[in-house]
Amino acid sequence: MKTLLLLGALTAGLVACGTDDTDGTNDGGGSDATNGVDSPFGNKDGSGSSDGGSTGDSCYAPVDMYIMQDRSGSMGDDCNIGQTVNSKWCHAINALSGYFNSTAASGNAAAIQFFPLPNQSNALCATGTGYDVAALPTPPPAYTTLPTNTFDSLLNSQNDQGGGGTPTEAAIRGLTKFTAGNRRGGRVTIGVLVTDGDPNGCDENLTNLSNLLQAHFQATTLRTFVIGMTGATDANLEQIAQGGMGPLHAATVGPLTNACGTSAAPCRHWNVGDGDPQAFIAALAAIQQASDGCVDGGGTVNPN
């Protein structure tokens, strides 16, 4: 229940517009006056409208997110949604299902792919081919509107046995191609990379990987967020996330008490430990809030 309340509080910011953020940045502070709880990227004056309308000082800029989920062998044992197998994979698919089905995500949309692909090879490293196509939905449309249980059957059918290694370069190239090629007017497009490991296979140079995301941001103004799970090195993920240009956030964000892991706060990547569903959902909700195109420092709203 605490998680769903947090989701509701964070999502309320998606329809707030015309606020006055005195320093023009998202500093991890702020209070949501409507809900009476701290919002990690909330409007400081609490004056935002929540009616989702297009008149007055309100606006509506929902988020389209492309999630690239690690399914390397280190994610642990397989399970189905609702089961409580103590593995990062099981935690992750339960958290993703919880977020996709939550009414707090209403109006936003998602697409998902997994890495490594079963046919992963070195030839895919420099192109991202296959990773630039969602496992769900099968376009058109490019994204599935939330909330929905449409993803549940896919999550149950997948497992943590991809083609071997953690080909982060291929995943990033596919993610950036997908988000650049699937921008819908009046909405904010973001990429979300979720991994429990350091790059293993393809280009493993952290500067090069960060530069791929930086070049994507400079060309498109689209942000890429990085979520790390136990097994990944926080310093490495933070270096990659710097290129993605997600807003800086504090170490404590809602129920997340170690959101930067071992990296100094504020940081850009998100640490969710072993993928505890409450922490994972809270991170997705905070990322959604950080992408709010209706507040200073939020995501870029795609032109109509």
Model features per residue range: what roles?
Residues 14-58, 219:
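Ser/Thr-rich, Pro/Gly/Ala-heavy low-complexity intrinsically disordered linkers and tails
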Residues 36-44, 162-166, 170, 197-259, ...:
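VWA/integrin I-like adhesion module and closely mimicked acidic/polar interface patches used
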Residues 58-59, 254-304:
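C-terminal "exit" segments of structured domains
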Residues 39, 58-141, 171-175, 190-195, 224-232, ...:
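Von Willebrand factor
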Residues 73, 97-105, 117, 156, ...:
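Sec-exported extracytoplasmic/periplasmic mature domains
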Residues 1-15:
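Sec-dependent bacterial lipoprotein signal peptides
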